[in-house]
């Protein structure tokens, strides 16, 4: 392999895809831009693995915007979270070192065991080049879903600002809108500049976002986005943060998680106060939504579109994924944050418990959500310290060379 082959990309062929290495000319341009401190300009459309039916998606909504004329009225728990959100704003251009490259053999440096078809006959038949393509595409697919989900969170949180009746919740939701914009920016840049490959939104994730946005009740936006989508995203981010060997991948997810832990706490605080006021019928409707949403999120991680894009036998891959013990453990672990949150906000009727038992995730009910959120903050701060030490050491070495 040529020593300059340190960045990977995919070349689109018709409606499918074919992963290769970044051309030398493109590498020289990118290095010049890095030296000048400029971002690479590119169109997302040119990086999608398949043609889309347009670059826009409109979701019709019918809801009322709430104004409140009492401005000195707020729950201390939410106001405290709001102040924390203001203090912890950050700039992805300066906090993240974008000069770092990805490994062409394994961009994020993730264990192969986390690939859904690892150990399958399909995987075992592949040569190293084929496995490299799968690593690239699976990771790009996952980050693409993070990206689309973060845009969903951006839109949903803007809706919460309008809908939620309390001024304290409006204050915090406004800080989250900024957070989500930053997350979209960071994941978009990671895909554009480093992977140069983007997958469309998974249909299951798209369906849940659409259901969340179409519902006119303000609490359903919280429930669908703050609790379900952000909850499973936190668990997925955590796997990359904790297992990735690439420092760029680790830092992006660690810093996003620091914000997301606050977002889930926001949903918990708002809904925990509101749900005791619901009638049995209203609570049943929420529980049905949660059950359906959790099944959609579970099925989101099948990644059928990746196997199809790469020309692999989709039916054989699906059969393996459906019966893989490794994938069962992986998929259930993604609900480690959702289950205790659902219990905490008071949606813990027989329907929820049965569904969670059937999915094999009921055991997460005793999880310490607050403790997990605190750990997310600690990990992000520790990463800042380590990266600062590495940068200082490198600068000292350069000065004495």
Language model segments and positions:
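Alpha-helix boundary/capping motif
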Residues: 3-5
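Short amphipathic alpha-helical segments with heptad-repeat character
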Residues: 144-147, 151, 174-177, 181, ...
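Amphipathic, well-ordered alpha-helical segments in soluble domains
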Residues: 149-156, 183, 229-236, 263
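Active-site-proximal alpha-helical scaffolds that flank and shape metal-associated catalytic sites
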Residues: 189-261, 285-296
């Amino acid at each position: 392999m040529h020593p300059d082959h340190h960045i990977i990309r995919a070349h689109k062929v018709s409606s499918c895809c074919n992963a290769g290495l970044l051309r030398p000319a493109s590498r020289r341009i990118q290095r010049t831009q890095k030296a000048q401190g400029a971002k690479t300009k590119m169109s997302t459309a040119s990086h999608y693995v398949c043609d889309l039916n347009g670059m826009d998606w409109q979701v019709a909504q019918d809801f009322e915007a709430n104004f409140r004329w009492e401005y000195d009225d707020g729950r201390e728990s939410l106001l405290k979270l709001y102040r924390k959100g203001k203090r912890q704003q950050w700039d992805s251009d300066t906090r993240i070192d974008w000069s770092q490259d990805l490994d062409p053999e394994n961009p994020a440096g993730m264990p192969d065991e986390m690939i859904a078809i690892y150990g399958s006959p399909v995987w075992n038949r592949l040569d190293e080049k084929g496995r490299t393509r799968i690593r690239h595409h699976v990771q790009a697919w996952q980050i693409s879903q993070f990206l689309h989900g973060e845009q969903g969170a951006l839109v949903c949180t803007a809706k919460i600002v309008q809908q939620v009746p309390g001024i304290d919740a409006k204050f915090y939701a406004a800080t989250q809108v900024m957070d989500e914009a930053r997350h979209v920016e960071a994941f978009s840049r990671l895909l554009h500049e480093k992977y140069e490959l983007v997958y469309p939104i998974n249909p299951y994730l798209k369906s849940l976002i659409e259901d969340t946005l179409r519902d006119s009740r303000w609490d359903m936006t919280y429930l669908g986005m703050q609790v379900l989508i952000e909850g499973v995203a936190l668990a997925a981010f955590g796997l990359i943060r904790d297992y990735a060997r690439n420092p760029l991948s680790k830092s992006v997810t660690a810093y996003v998680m620091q914000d997301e832990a606050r977002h889930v706490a926001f949903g918990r605080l708002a809904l925990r106060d509101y749900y005791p006021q619901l009638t049995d019928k209203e609570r049943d409707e929420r529980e049905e939504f949660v059950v359906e949403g959790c099944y959609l999120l579970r099925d989101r991680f099948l990644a059928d579109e990746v196997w199809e894009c790469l020309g692999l036998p989709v039916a054989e891959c699906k059969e393996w994924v459906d019966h893989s013990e490794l994938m069962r453990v992986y998929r259930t672990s993604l609900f480690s944050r959702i289950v205790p949150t659902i219990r905490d906000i008071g949606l813990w009727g027989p329907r929820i418990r049965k569904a969670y038992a059937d999915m094999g995730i009921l055991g997460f009910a005793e999880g310490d959500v607050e403790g997990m959120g605190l750990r997310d903050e600690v990990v992000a701060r520790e990463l800042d310290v380590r990266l600062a030490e590495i940068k200082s050491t490198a600068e000292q070495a350069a000065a004495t060379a």
